[in-house]
Amino acid sequence: MSEEESKTKVVILTRSYRIKGYIHLQPGARVTDFMIDSKNFMAVTNVEVWDLGGRQIMTSPFVNVSRDHVEIITPDTA
């Protein structure tokens, strides 16, 4: 992460998983801008992956999430 980027905590929902982690945004950028600019995959750091039943199935310092599988992405305010 460069000094110009800031971490934003997000929740990502796919058909199978709830993913919590951080995306790295340029100053002034929105989550919407991040999604528009993403290619096939988006980098997420400090990740927790949960199944839809609420069971945590993995943690990882980094994952690439397929943009095509993202149904909802929202800032995590919890």
Segments from the language model and where they lie:
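Conserved RNA-binding domains used in RNP assembly and mRNA/RNA metabolism
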Residues: 1-78
